[in-house]
Swiss-Prot record:
GO terms for cellular component: cytosol. Residues 1-14 have a biased composition (Basic residues). It is found in: Cytoplasm. This is Probable transcriptional regulatory protein OB2038. Belongs to the TACO1 family. The lineage of its organism: Bacteria, Bacillati, Bacillota, Bacilli, Bacillales. Keywords: Cytoplasm, DNA-binding, Transcription, Transcription regulation. One of its GO terms (biological process) is regulation of DNA-templated transcription. It comes from Oceanobacillus iheyensis (strain DSM 14371 / CIP 107618 / JCM 11309 / KCTC 3954 / HTE831). Transmembrane segments: none annotated. Residues 1-21 are annotated as: Disordered. SUPFAM superfamilies: YebC-like (SSF75625). Its main location: cytoplasm. It comes from the Bacteria.
Length: 243
């Protein structure tokens, strides 16, 4: 994973995603809903919820909206019932794609996802058709914009906390954990005053698929089309993106 920085790819696509700010509160609301549904509504013990709330606040989402979605997820407030669904398939050039959605209308969402694949040179597969090509890992980014953090110190602290790998990047350090160790590592780092730019349990491809310039352009159009859906939460793929 050291040669394929998720953080760099996040930064690379941020400007494009910022152009879709009209949907950003809906995305944050669903992130908060998922985190609270899976781990409870206590920010002190639910690192995923804490991260989702921090990201929402960074985009100026009102506190009332945040609280309302936590209450919906934990059952203390009536509202729409959302269902998590995972789609698997292939993009142009045989790129493996996993799409995580949260929807209150699975028929609508299935049609949107299927249309995005078909229109952009991909095809949906059965459950399990590509998921075996990915590993589930805890992923944490420690900010180091000023370059003041010492790599040896961070590495020792991260390993002490339970991380399995530390990768220095420009302006940040990426940490990887086993999923079951993720919460404890986040807690340890926060208690030791590290600033976390990102933290989540997510998927990483075991191998990467390098495409021709033409096929890569088609693949990026597929990703953009999927991101246009309000229901799509995460898109995982094994494309080796060119610089």
């Amino acid at each position: 994973m050291a040669g394929h920085s998720k953080w760099k790819n996040i930064q690379k696509r941020k400007n494009a995603q910022d152009a879709k700010k009209g949907k950003i509160f809906m995305r944050h609301a669903k992130d908060i809903y998922i985190a609270a549904k899976q781990g409870g509504g206590d920010l002190g013990t639910n690192a995923a919820l804490r991260t989702a709330v921090e990201k929402a606040k960074a985009d100026n989402m009102p506190n009332d909206n945040i609280d309302r979605n936590i209450k919906k997820a934990t059952g203390s407030l009536d509202g729409a019932t959302y269902e998590e669904i995972t789609y698997e398939g292939y993009g142009p050039g045989g790129v493996a794609v996993i799409v995580n959605v949260l929807t209150d209308n699975k028929n609508r969402t299935a049609a949107e996802v299927r249309h995005a694949f078909k229109k952009n040179g991909g095809n949906l597969g059965e459950n399990g058709s590509v998921s075996f090509m990915f590993d589930r890992k805890g992923y944490i980014v420690i900010e180091n914009e000023e370059g003041t953090l010492d790599e040896d110190t961070i590495t020792m602290d991260a390993l002490e906390a339970g991380a399995e790998d530390v990768v220095p990047q420009e302006g940040a350090f990426e940490l990887y954990t086993e999923p079951e160790d993720f919460q404890e590592v986040v807690k340890y780092l926060e208690e030791n005053d590290y600033t976390l730019a990102d933290s989540e349990v997510t998927l990483f491809p075991q191998n990467y698929n390098q495409l021709s310039q033409e096929d890569e352009a088609k693949m990026m159009k597929l990703i953009d089309a999927l991101e246009d859906s309000e229901d799509v939460q995460d898109i995982h793929h094994n494309l080796e993106e060119s610089n």
